[in-house]
Amino acid sequence: MADPASNVLRLHDTHLRDKRPFTPLDPENVRVYFCGPTVYDRAHLGNLRAMMCADILIRLLRTMYPRVTYVRNVTDVDDKINARAKENGEDISALTERTTQAFHEDLASLFILPPDIEPRATHHIDDMLEMIGRLVENGHAYVAEGHVLFAVRNFPSYGELSGRSLDDMIAGARVEVAPYKRDPGDFVLWKPSEPDLPGWDSPYGRGRPGWHIECSAMSHRYLGESFDIHGGGDDLLFPHHENERAQSMCCYPHGKFATHWVHNGMLLSNGEKMSKSLGNFFTIREVLDRSPAEPLRLLYLGAHYRSTLDFSWEKLEEARRVLDRLYRALERGNAQPGTALPAAVMDALCDDLNTPLAIAALHPLADAAMQGDQDAASSLLAAGKLLGLFNVTPAEWFQSGVDASAIEKLIEERLAARKSRDFARADAIRAQLAADGITLEDGPGGTTWRKA
């Protein structure tokens, strides 16, 4: 069995483009920041990828270190939010509250751990303005026509995180460059806001923050100038994370900002990029309306976080069948809580969160548990809990998604038929239930049922 304290976690660092041992700045308090949602619509399966990556990382870190401070922001001021509220004829605050609550409900349904701190951008405007003021003062930002822009040429390592050359980025740009920019690569820290849109008074006039400064200000507010891990989807690597790193390191030159960068791969649907026009675009809620949560969770765990994950309904059904077998093993082996984690599972997760290998390590335990090995069943339970699985009892799992009252009524009818020696009717009821995937088990205490 594994001793979590003796394991060494090796994580791929996007910045160094290599897998390396994770060494926290303070082993007594590991500090982690993940970019959260922009709350203008229901979260979709692609959004879920980063949240699952963060969840497994946080679960693992909490088995290895005494304290983990996990911060995940909510972006509640954004042009997409403004446009959607106008399209809906809805108040902006009503839209952001509704979609934030829906986001929380979706993640809770999937047993994803909440962050310790969940700052909202609109609650940290003063923190953003303080950073912007420092950047203007030290020459890394400038004011132009009511905008404040970051001067990328003044930060020599700009592009280092994403592996891009600034000159190549500018040469490849096809968008029209705003005339007030000194350099085409300069990005907005603050911009003017129209009277009918959210805005705050500032030394630069009434306006609102740019996207990138929001995360820099909130991570600094709760985690300081240096923290351990910054994560998110690889679609955020450039420009968002590149710009975060630049403005934070220029604002606080004695800090390291994030010492380790973790990025997850993207999601396909039936082998193609999700698109409403292709009919393969699904929100989390749409999937959970058709399936229990744990199969979706297992499907995500079945792909390494840095690889591309391909969603399909067939794969979701296969994940459900796998869970049927694992839950059956827990039941047969009479799994008990409190067992140490299996070494094979810890070793897999400590190797860059290798969840496919961790899932593979569950199957030998399930094989033994199916033969009545209680130790194996208990180890299986402990491993599954670390992975965020086995959130219900086997009895609850096998009775989910069926009409329990209708089954109980048929069992009572069968009992009455047997008492009246109408064995043909009793056998017909058993056969009817078996055809629906329900197995009856007669014992001294009466008849119980389970999904086959």
UniProtKB/Swiss-Prot annotation:
Cofactor note: Binds 1 zinc ion per subunit.
One Pfam family recorded for the sequence: CysS_C
Gene Ontology cellular component annotations, sorted alphabetically: cytosol
Record note on quaternary structure: Monomer.
Positions with a binding annotation for ATP: K276
Source species of the chain: Gluconobacter oxydans (strain 621H)
Molecular function GO labels: ATP binding; cysteine-tRNA ligase activity; zinc ion binding
Binding-site residues for Zn(2+), renumbered to this chain: C35, C215, H240, E244
Family listed: Belongs to the class-I aminoacyl-tRNA synthetase family.
Keywords: Aminoacyl-tRNA synthetase, ATP-binding, Cytoplasm, Ligase, Metal-binding, Nucleotide-binding, Protein biosynthesis, Zinc
Motif extent ('HIGH' region): 37-47
Localization terms from the record: Cytoplasm
Top enzyme category: ligase
Protein name: Cysteine--tRNA ligase
